[in-house]
UniProtKB/Swiss-Prot annotation:
This is Dihydromethanophenazine:CoB--CoM heterodisulfide reductase subunit E. One of its GO terms (molecular function) is CoB--CoM heterodisulfide reductase activity. Part of a complex that catalyzes the reversible reduction of CoM-S-S-CoB to the thiol-coenzymes H-S-CoM (coenzyme M) and H-S-CoB (coenzyme B). HdrE may be responsible for anchoring the complex to the membrane. It is an enzyme of class 1 (oxidoreductase). It catalyses: methanophenazine + coenzyme B + coenzyme M = dihydromethanophenazine + coenzyme M-coenzyme B heterodisulfide. The dihydromethanophenazine:CoB--CoM heterodisulfide reductase is composed of two subunits; HdrD and HdrE. Binds 2 heme b (iron(II)-protoporphyrin IX) groups per subunit. The gene is hdrE. It is a multi-pass membrane protein. It comes from Methanosarcina mazei (strain ATCC BAA-159 / DSM 3647 / Goe1 / Go1 / JCM 11833 / OCM 88) (Methanosarcina frisia).
């Protein structure tokens, strides 16, 4: 199957090259996560804070402690784990109770982002299945075409959430005044990843998002989107405020959710 990304139409990325780039991003991510687990194991709870001098936590001990707390008998306000997963983590009911608009923004970003990630995982699974010689009723290229519609749908859902976030940061005074540089970097990164995906697809297909750009630029545009997605959406997470997408669910599960 030919990939859309490349330096040019004649120099498109291969499966092995895509896997190497992905592996690099995953290794950087895992290294950062181990560091975060060590800090949390040492009692650090704030973003960008370091453990006290001479104190070093254990990633394994942190995970064991967290899992023990998740499995511990529920305290008075605790909720069943399945309820916490569905209502507190997926549907984010805590945010909904505080602000419906903010909830809609968060939910569209979360649902769009995670759905696109899941679709990418399915695409990877189909490619790997073919590589190991298992025959499927469709080729990877045909499966990619099947995923095009849901990719568009969830891409636009993500875009709606991102645009709401941009408008809030720019024009809602209390949100703008409370924003710090980390917030702008996070939002800017998500915006660039989202828009670059639409533009890369638009150049290739000739739809409105192509803005009349030469089709020759389609492979480099797709390559830019692929690389920045791997860097920002995977490798950068443990080193940024974006770590809250992992830390918050862990804390909610450990506390058994609820209000």
């Amino acid at each position: 199957m030919a990939y859309f990304s490349g330096l040019s139409d004649a120099l498109r990325l291969t499966f092995v090259q895509i896997m190497i780039l992905s592996a690099i991003a995953v290794v950087i991510f895992l290294y950062g996560m181990i560091g975060n687990f060590q800090k949390w194991g040492a009692g650090v709870t704030g973003y960008a804070l370091e453990p006290p001098t001479g104190k070093k936590g254990s990633a394994i001990r942190f995970l064991k402690t967290w899992w023990a707390q998740v499995r511990a008998e529920s305290h008075h306000h605790g909720k069943p784990i399945l309820e916490v997963l569905i209502l507190d983590i997926f549907f984010q009911r805590r945010i909904l109770k505080r602000s419906p608009i903010r909830w809609f923004m968060h939910f569209t970003i979360f649902a769009g982002w995670m759905s696109l990630f899941a679709l990418s995982g399915l695409m990877f699974a189909v490619e790997m299945t073919e590589k190991i010689g298992i025959e499927l009723p469709f080729t990877p290229a045909e499966f990619r075409e099947m995923l095009s519609l849901p990719n568009y749908i969830f891409g636009y859902i993500l875009l709606i959430g991102v645009m709401i976030a941009v408008v809030r940061r720019l024009f809602v005074s209390e949100v703008r005044e409370a924003s710090i540089m980390y917030d702008w970097v996070l939002l800017g990164g998500v915006f660039i990843v989202t828009i670059s995906g639409f533009i890369a697809d638009g150049i290739r297909t000739g739809i409105i998002w192509g803005f009349g750009l030469d089709p020759v630029t389609a492979p480099p545009a797709a390559l830019f989107h692929s690389v920045i997605s791997l860097l920002f959406c995977i490798a950068y997470i443990p080193y940024s405020k974006y770590i809250h997408v992992i830390a918050t669910p862990l804390a909610i599960l450990a506390n058994k959710g609820g209000e």
